[in-house]
Amino acid sequence: MVVEESAQYQPGFVQLLTGDFNTRYDSKVFTSVRSGGWKESYETIHGEGEAGFTGHAFQGVDYVKGSSKGRIDFIWYRGQVKPVDAAIIKDAINGKYPSDHFFMQADFVIE
């Protein structure tokens, strides 16, 4: 649905697609997203799509991942925009995490 919806805009139109996708980087969902011309910011900057687990059940870096592994939070982009930085933010305040997922961050320039 996202691929079809985004295709209605001119090719250079800047679009961002972000969030907790609850699916791994190598899934069929992302194969479909890529086929629509979307690129993933962390992969573009760091040369790798898999950057470790981003969900942590409010336990942060101490979370035991079990059988689930891999990043499920992404910042996708298309159009005349380019990421210049991307990171996984693992900050806590007084030992408490504001979310059960680490935050994804990306800085872009509009071309």
Regions found by a protein language model. Give the residues of each.
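Catalytic-adjacent loop/helix segments of enzymes that bind and process anionic phosphate/sulfate esters
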Residues: 1
